C-alpha cells in the first residue's frame, strides 16, 4: 500500500507508488490525466491536471444515449422476433427480462461511468482485480465499430441508387441480372403447380431482381469464405464516406457529438411516422399488423422465445460495450442518472414496438400484392433492409421517394450508433494515457487512427466474399453470448465484490436518494441468474454458422469466429489470474488488496468518513476547505 501523509486535511501519496490516469505524476514526474485540477504529490507540489469534458446540456447526454442504443436492431430485428415468437405474447418475456436484466444493467453502466468519471477500462478502478471487464468491453466495441459500419455503407449505396426515376432493383435486364430474373409474380400464377407449398420463384427456379441486385451487384457474392475475390469499388467509396462522416462527428469530443445527435437521433422518428402513415394506407397493411400482434399463447412454453427475448434486450440496450459507461462519465457528478436510465429504457423498447407497426404494415401490403402468406416475406436483419423492404417499395407509387426516405432513416439510425460506439472506444483508450503523453490534437489523431485501422479491416468485407466475413463478425464477435458473459460479470463484481449496498450508497451520494431496492436485488440475484441461464442455453444449443441456409462455413472459419468471441470473454479470467499471480502475500491478502477501490480526483468534492482512504464506502459533500484527495496505490 502507498505511503500516506496528511497535511491540512489533504492526503498525499509518494510519487513513485502512483500510477494510472486518475492520478499524477508518472514515472518521469509529468502529471497524469485526471478529472479536474488538483494539488498532488509531495506536500507543497502543484501539478496541473486537465479537466474532463462534461455535456453542455443534460439533454445532450439523453440524445446521445438514444442515438446509440436505438439502432438498426430495433427496426429490423425486434418486429420479426415478435411475429415469430407468438405476436403480442412475445411482449411478456420481453418486458419481464427488460425489468429483470435490461434496465438494471443499463442503469448500472451509466451510473458507474458517472460515479467513477472514467471510460470503459478505468471505470473498473472500483474493483481493480476485475479490470479485465474493461478490456473485454473495448474488444467487443472495437469489433462492433469494425463490422457495424458495413450496414451504413450498404444503406448509403442504396440511398444513392434511389435517386433515379426507376429503381435499379425493380427491373431485370441489367448487366448483373441473370436469365432467370423475373420482375413480378403472383402466387395465383402457380395454381397448376404440383407443389403448392413452394413459391413461384422456387417452382420455376426464378429469381427476383431485388435479390439479384443485392447479391450480384452490391455484394457480388462469391462461392464462399475461401474465395475472397476483388474489391467492390463502389461500395468501398460508400464505406470511406461513412468513415469520414463518423470521424467528423467524433473528432472534437462530446461537446460536438452532443449537438449532432439532436438530428441523427430524432429525424428517424419523423421518417418512421411518415412511413407508418404511408404503410397503413396500403392494401393488406391491417393483415400485416394483425400477424405482428396476433397472440399465440402456446409459444410461452418454448424456451427459444425466452432466449430470443433475452438476447434482443441485451443487444438493443447496447449493454456490455462500455459506450454507455463512457457517455455517463461525461455527466455532472450529481446528475440524476437513475431517472435518465428509466427514461432511456422506455424510449428504447417503445421504439422497437412502434417500428413493428411500420415494418409489418409494409410486409402485409407486400404479401397481398404477391398473393402469398406473410411468412413468405417476413425477414429480419439485412434480409429485411436490403431485400424485403426494397421489394415492397417497388410496388408503391413514387417508389424512389419511399426508398430514399427508408435508406436515409437507416443511415441515420446506424450513424449515431456507430459514432457513439467509436466515442466509447476512444474515451476508454485516452483515459489510459498518462498526461505525460498529452499533446495538442491528441484526440483528433487518435480518432483518425482508430477510423483508419477499422477501415482497413473493413476492406475484407467489401470483397466478393465480404458478406461471409461480415457474418462471422456479426455472429461471434458481439453476439448474445459475449454480451451475456459481460453482463453477468458486471453484476457479480458490483453486487458481490464491491457490494450492492455500498454502490447504492454511492448512487445516493450522486442523486440524493437511494434507488428502488429492486435494482439491488436484480444486481445481486435475478440478473446474473438470467444472464447465465441464457448464456448456458446459447452454448449448449449452439449451431454452426450457415449463410442464407445454404453455405456452411469451413472448420477454420468457425475457428476464427470462436477466436473473436474468446478474445473478449477470456479478458476477465486472464486479467484476474495475472493480477493474483503478480501480487504478494497470502491469497486472502492478495484478494483484499486487489479488490480495494482506486478513487479518482473528482472525489475531491467528497470526504471519506473514516481515516483510511482505501476503506471509502460512503461519500458526503464537504466544504472547499476540507477536501480529501483520494488516490491509488501500486497494484
UniProtKB/Swiss-Prot annotation:
Which InterPro entries does the UniProt record give? Na/ntran_symport, Na/ntran_symport_creatine, SNS_sf
Source gene? Answer: SLC6A8
Function as written in the Swiss-Prot or TrEMBL entry: Creatine:sodium symporter which mediates the uptake of creatine. Plays an important role in supplying creatine to the brain via the blood-brain barrier.
What is the official name of this protein in its record? Answer: Sodium- and chloride-dependent creatine transporter 1
Q: At which residues is Phosphothreonine found?
A: 617, 620
Which species is the source of this protein? Answer: Bos taurus
Higher taxonomy: Eukaryota, Metazoa, Chordata, Craniata, Vertebrata
Keywords recorded for this protein, A-Z: Cell membrane, Glycoprotein, Ion transport, Membrane, Phosphoprotein, Sodium, Sodium transport, Symport, Transmembrane, Transmembrane helix, Transport
Entry keyword Ion transport: yes
Q: How is it modified after translation?
A: Glycosylated.
Residues in compartment: Extracellular: 82-87, 160-230, 291-304, 363-394, 466-479, 542-560
Amino acid at each position: 500500500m502507498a505511503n500516506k501523509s496528511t497535511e491540512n486535511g489533504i492526503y498525499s501519496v509518494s510519487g513513485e507508488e502512483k500510477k494510472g490516469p486518475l492520478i499524477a505524476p508518472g514515472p518521469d514526474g509529468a502529471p497524469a490525466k485526471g478529472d479536474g485540477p488538483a494539488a498532488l504529490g509531495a506536500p507543497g507540489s502543484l501539478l496541473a491536471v486537465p479537466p474532463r469534458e462534461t455535456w453542455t446540456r443534460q439533454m445532450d447526454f439523453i440524445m446521445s444515449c438514444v442515438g446509440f442504443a436505438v439502432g438498426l436492431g430495433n427496426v429490423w430485428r425486434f418486429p420479426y422476433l415478435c411475429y415469430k415468437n407468438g405476436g403480442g405474447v412475445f411482449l411478456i418475456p420481453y418486458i419481464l427480462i427488460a425489468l429483470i436484466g435490461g434496465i438494471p444493467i443499463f442503469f448500472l453502466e451509466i451510473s458507474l461511468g458517472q460515479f467513477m468519471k472514467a471510460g470503459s477500462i478505468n471505470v473498473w478502478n472500483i474493483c481493480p482485480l476485475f479490470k479485465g471487464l474493461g478490456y473485454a468491453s473495448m474488444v467487443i466495441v472495437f469489433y462492433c465499430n469494425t463490422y457495424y459500419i458495413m450496414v451504413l455503407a450498404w444503406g448509403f449505396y442504396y440511398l444513392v441508387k434511389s435517386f433515379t426515376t426507376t429503381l435499379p432493383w425493380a427491373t431485370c435486364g441489367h448487366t448483373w441480372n441473370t436469365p432467370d430474373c423475373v420482375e413480378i409474380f403472383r402466387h395465383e400464377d402457380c395454381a397448376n403447380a404440383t407443389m403448392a407449398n413452394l413459391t413461384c420463384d422456387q417452382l420455376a427456379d426464378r429469381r427476383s431482381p431485388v435479390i439479384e441486385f443485392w447479391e450480384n451487384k452490391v455484394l457480388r457474392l462469391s462461392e464462399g469464405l475461401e474465395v475472397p475475390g476483388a474489391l467492390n469499388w463502389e461500395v468501398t467509396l460508400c464505406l470511406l464516406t461513412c468513415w469520414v462522416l463518423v470521424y467528423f462527428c467524433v473528432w472534437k469530443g462530446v461537446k460536438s457529438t452532443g449537438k449532432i445527435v439532436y438530428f441523427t437521433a430524432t429525424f428517424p422518428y419523423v421518417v418512421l411516422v411518415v412511413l407508418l402513415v404511408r404503410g397503413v394506407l396500403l392494401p393488406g397493411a391491417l393483415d400485416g399488423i394483425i400477424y405482428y400482434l396476433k397472440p399465440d399463447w402456446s409459444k410461452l412454453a418454448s424456451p427459444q422465445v425466452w432466449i430470443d427475448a433475452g438476447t434482443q434486450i441485451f443487444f438493443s440496450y447496447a449493454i456490455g460495450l462500455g459506450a454507455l459507461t463512457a457517455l455517463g462519465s461525461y455527466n455532472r457528478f450529481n446528475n440524476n442518472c437513475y431517472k435518465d436510465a428509466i427514461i432511456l429504457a422506455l424510449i428504447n423498447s417503445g421504439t422497437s414496438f412502434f417500428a413493428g407497426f411500420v415494418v409489418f404494415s409494409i410486409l402485409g401490403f407486400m404479401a397481398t400484392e404477391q398473393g402469398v402468406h406473410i411468412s413468405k416475406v417476413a425477414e429480419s436483419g439485412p434480409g429485411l433492409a436490403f431485400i424485403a423492404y426494397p421489394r415492397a417499395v417497388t410496388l408503391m407509387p413514387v417508389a424512389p421517394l419511399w426508398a430514399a426516405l427508408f435508406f436515409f432513416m437507416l443511415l441515420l439510425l446506424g450513424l449515431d450508433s456507430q459514432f457513439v460506439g467509436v466515442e466509447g472506444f476512444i474515451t476508454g483508450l485516452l483515459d489510459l494515457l498518462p498526461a505525460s503523453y498529452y499533446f495538442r490534437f491528441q484526440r483528433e489523431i487518435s480518432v483518425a487512427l482508430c477510423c483508419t485501422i477499422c477501415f482497413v479491416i473493413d476492406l475484407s468485407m467489401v470483397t466478393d466474399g465480404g458478406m461471409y466475413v461480415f457474418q462471422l463478425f456479426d455472429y461471434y464477435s458481439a453476439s448474445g453470448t459475449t454480451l451475456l458473459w459481460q453482463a453477468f460479470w458486471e453484476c457479480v463484481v458490483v453486487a458481490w465484490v464491491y457490494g450492492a449496498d455500498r454502490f447504492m450508497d454511492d448512487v445516493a451520494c450522486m442523486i440524493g436518494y437511494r434507488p428502488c431496492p429492486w435494482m439491488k436485488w436484480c444486481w445481486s440475484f435475478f440478473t446474473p441468474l438470467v444472464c447465465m441461464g441464457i448464456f448456458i442455453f446459447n452454448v449448449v444449443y449452439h449451431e454452426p454458422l450457415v449463410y442464407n441456409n445454404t453455405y456452411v462455413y469451413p472448420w477454420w472459419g468457425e475457428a476464427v469466429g470462436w477466436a473473436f468471441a474468446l478474445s473478449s470473454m477470456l479478458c476477465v479470467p486472464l486479467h484476474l489470474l495475472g493480477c493474483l499471480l503478480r501480487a504478494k502475500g497470502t491469497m486472502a491478502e492478495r484478494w483484499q488488496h486487489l479488490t480495494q477501490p482506486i478513487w479518482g480526483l473528482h472525489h475531491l468534492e467528497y470526504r471519506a468518513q473514516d481515516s483510511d482512504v482505501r476503506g471509502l464506502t460512503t461519500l458526503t459533500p464537504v466544504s472547499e476547505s476540507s477536501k480529501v484527495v483520494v488516490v491509488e496505490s501500486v497494484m
